[in-house]
Regions:
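C-terminal motif of bacterial Sec signal peptides marking the signal peptidase cleavage site
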Residues: 15-19
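Ligand-binding clefts/hinges and TM-proximal coupling segments of bilobed small-molecule sensing domains
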Residues: 135-151, 224-295
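Pocket-lining segment of extracytoplasmic ligand-binding domains
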Residues: 83-85, 92-95, 160-251, 257
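Short helix-loop capping/hinge motifs at secondary-structure junctions, enriched
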Residues: 122-129, 257-260, 313
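Positively charged n-region of N-terminal signal peptides that target proteins for export
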Residues: 1-8
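An extracytoplasmic/periplasmic, membrane-proximal ligand-sensing/linker region
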Residues: 40, 168, 172, 179, ...
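Bilobed "Venus flytrap"/periplasmic-binding protein-like clamshell domains
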Residues: 24-51, 55-56, 113-179, 293, ...
Length: 317
């Protein structure tokens, strides 16, 4: 009888610990291996492990929506997402219309600008308007890239029906461009993006500007867009700056994560900006200001605690 009681108590302790989750090991959803999320996520994971003692298993995923759903399902505890997709999830609209509003994630901080990059090798495509009648990859249906492409087409007076849409991932878009199966592709990622770098070197691809009246209308209709310049020589053969629009790559965390763990993660990242800058080009955009501005969902209380120590107040929940 005594032995049974001891076993039952042990079982209760195990179940209790499992329900709290293992805060020393977390899984981070990122993106495709040819995108910026995956490589940058690896850098963040290493920094978190070295400074906070939390092991982060970085996994390749289908991107922002998959990452948010993964957190909601309990498969991931951390994830990188586009700020606009995060807004859709919080409101239960666009790509999250079917799922409804989700409240299972919180913001840790903004990371860097995710440029909307319109890539082509077709010399007749000089503007968004020139996409009419062309085969264009606009990302997976319902993805963040898809809605970015739809927004930009609309700002140029076009609809999905005015092009020959192809619903492809970063890697598939790059392969299709290289094989001349499509005429252009929308790729949303931090520049330089590995997939685009390869295209510019191997196939003389180039970027089409998204600027002027198109950018103005886009920002008027959707305030999470801002203008952004991709500096000259970011890609092979790019002689001049290219103006486009951007959303923001954001690190989010599950609401199940403790305040202490999230505080330590936030501190591990933003107390070590120089180390992250040295490890990845997009680290140059990492700052307290960038981390706390333009967010479209509430911060985790652990992150808010860290930023409060830096005299920055953010909305938390």
């Amino acid at each position: 009888m005594k032995r049974i009681v001891i076993l039952m108590l042990a079982l209760v302790m195990v179940i209790g610990l499992a329900s709290c989750g293992n805060t020393n090991v977390m899984t981070m959803g990122t993106g495709g291996t040819q995108g910026t999320y995956y490589g940058y996520g690896g850098i963040l994971g290493n920094q978190i492990k070295n400074s906070a003692g939390i092991t982060v298993n970085v996994v390749s995923t289908d991107g922002s929506k998959a990452n948010i759903l993964g957190i909601d399902a309990g498969n991931y505890q951390l994830a990188t997402v586009q700020s606009d997709v995060m807004a859709y999830a919080a409101a239960g609209e666009r790509s999250f219309e079917k799922e409804g509003a989700l409240d299972s994630f919180r913001v840790i901080g903004g990371l860097y600008a995710e440029a909307v990059q319109l890539v082509t090798m077709d010399p007749s495509i000089k503007s968004v308007a020139d996409l009419a009648g062309k085969k264009v990859s606009i990302g997976a249906a319902g993805s963040g890239v898809y809605f970015n492409a739809i927004d930009i087409l609309a700002a140029a007076g076009l609809t999905e029906n005015d092009i020959v849409p192809q619903y492809q991932s970063f890697g598939d878009s790059a392969d299709a461009l290289k094989d001349k199966k499509i005429d252009a592709a929308f790729i949303v990622a931090g520049a330089p993006t590995p997939a685009i770098q390869e295209l510019c070197i191997a196939a003389s691809a180039y970027l089409v500007p998204i600027d002027g009246a198109i950018a103005d209308k886009l920002m008027q209709d959707s305030p999470y867009y801002t203008t952004y310049k991709i500096p000259a020589n970011t890609y092979n053969g790019q002689a001049e700056d290219v103006t486009t629009v951007t959303v923001k790559a954001t690190l989010i965390v599950s609401t199940s994560a403790s305040e202490e763990a999230v505080y330590n993660i936030t501190k591990a990242i933003f107390d070590n900006v120089d180390s992250i800058k040295a490890a990845h080009a997009k680290g140059a955009e990492l700052s307290l200001e960038n981390a706390t501005s333009g967010m479209t969902a509430p911060f985790h209380k652990g992150a808010a605690k860290y930023f409060a120590e830096k005299n920055i107040t953010v909305e938390s929940k």
